[in-house]
Amino acid sequence: MVQLDRFEILFNNPEQAYFAGQEISGKVIIENKEPKKVNEILLELKGRARTYWTKHSGKSRKHCSHSEPYFLEQFNPGYTHKFTVVKDGKEKERILPAGIHQVPFSYTLPKSLPSSFEGEFGHIRYTCKAICERPWDFDIVSRKAFTVVGIEDINSDPKLNEPATCVESNHAVTFCCRSAGSVTGEIRISKCGYTPGEKIDVSFKVINLSSKTRTTALRFVQQTTYKAKTFAGHEHIKNVVRVISKIDKGEVPGGSTTEWQEESITIPSLPPKLGKCKILSVTYSVELEVEQTLTVPCPIVIGSIPQLSQLLIHSKQSVQSAGNGSLPKSSIKDSPPKWDSESCVQVTITDESGQLVEELGNEMEALLSARKRVRMPSSILSELYPTMPSPYYKESFFGASDISEEKEQAQFGEASFAPKYPFYTD
């Protein structure tokens, strides 16, 4: 039976979204109207990828699953120690007084994390969990997910800023193996690397040398690949294709050629490539679809760090527009929230058990440095990309997913979660 009126995790960043390598900080809020017996208030930060599905073959079933851990930090801030009741020189119990209690925490995320992802057969998920241990009773748990954005830099590959052309042909065959004429599709894009919010400029052409009229469409597609293993260790792969958007482009009569110039597709809030995950991958493509004949895919890459030279030009144009009093309304509405540095809690340094360094002495300094457990405010984006404007965030195009887990039941916290991804343009 839950015996706390409030047990909530609050992050100092209201977006609850962090780039890999940044510091995550916040506090646990405990509210109780009456004094409560407790042992400890514990904290756990976890990040991992997981895949799972059931493979059916006749009457038999094979459960496939795999996981890839990234970090698991557990520490005890020692908040309840000051409420210890001592009788006859012996510690008896800890009584949490009635009122509102705040337990601050901070942790610097590893730099090599992949982005948060929620899919049909797996996820990459990052969570913070607070545990109230009670004597001779069940623990009370509060759990909250947050977004991590992996550093996937479009600038790292110059080819991603170059145009691309993809061509496919299909020779139709009719009765008695007679040729019915070929259909050729060609698709051209202005560049191959993007971030959410950017527009893909597409030009395409269909050469229909068959006798049949063909309908055409332009599709923006996401393909997710999940890798898992059975209990016996056999690896299985599952591919899932999602159509993000589709634009019908009309018909191409037999014996004719039709061409379209600069059709635009705006990229919604989608996860960037998961380059640092071994069991999950996400790829994207723009496809020209010709009815019952062929599909011409043109791969693109979605990253989390945009092409900086173009972004700076766009930013200067936005500033000039603002100076002329013509700032678009959307720029005002979607501008990133201001970070209140004064609201951040004090940075702490902890050992493996969560004890403060000040309580352990100076001899721990070298060990903590070696283990990279120094809790320091991170400005990784400003260090790596000093000219890059701050992003703002939007929830995933696919909406929220159920994140409740049978093995990690929580009495407090949200059962659903939608990752957020960075935008740099309006």
From Swiss-Prot:
Post-translational modification: Phosphorylated. Dephosphorylated by tax-6 in vitro.
GO MF, one annotated term: protein phosphatase 2B binding
Tissue: Expressed from the comma stage to adulthood in the nervous system, including sensory neurons and interneurons posterior to the nerve ring, dorsal and ventral nerve cords, tail ganglia and, CEP, HSN, ASK, ADL, ASH and ASJ neurons.
Keywords (A to Z) from UniProt: Behavior, Phosphoprotein
Effect of disrupting the coding gene: Viable. Shows defects in several behavioral responses, including abnormal avoidance response to the chemoattractant lysine and impaired adaptability induced by prior exposure to high concentration of fructose. Delay in egg-laying upon refeeding after starvation. Slight decrease in brood size.
A Pfam family matched in the record: Arrestin_N
Chain intervals with Polar residues compositional bias: 320-329
Record-annotated membrane-spanning stretches: none
One GO cellular component, as annotated: cytoplasm
UniProt feature, compositional bias: Basic and acidic residues: 331-340
UniProt superkingdom: Eukaryota
Segments for region (Disordered): 320-340
InterPro entries referenced in this protein's UniProt entry, alphabetically: Arrestin-like_C, Arrestin-like_N, Arrestin_C-like, Arrestin_domain-protein, Ig_E-set
Entry annotated with the keyword Phosphoprotein: yes
A GO biological-process term: protein transport
Keyword presence, Phosphoprotein: yes
Record family assignment: Belongs to the arrestin family.
Its biological purpose: Involved in several behavioral responses including chemotaxis towards lysine and adaptation to repeated osmotic stress. In addition, plays a role in resuming egg-laying and locomotion after starvation.
Subunit structure, as described in the record: Interacts with tax-6.
Protein name: Arrestin domain-containing protein 17
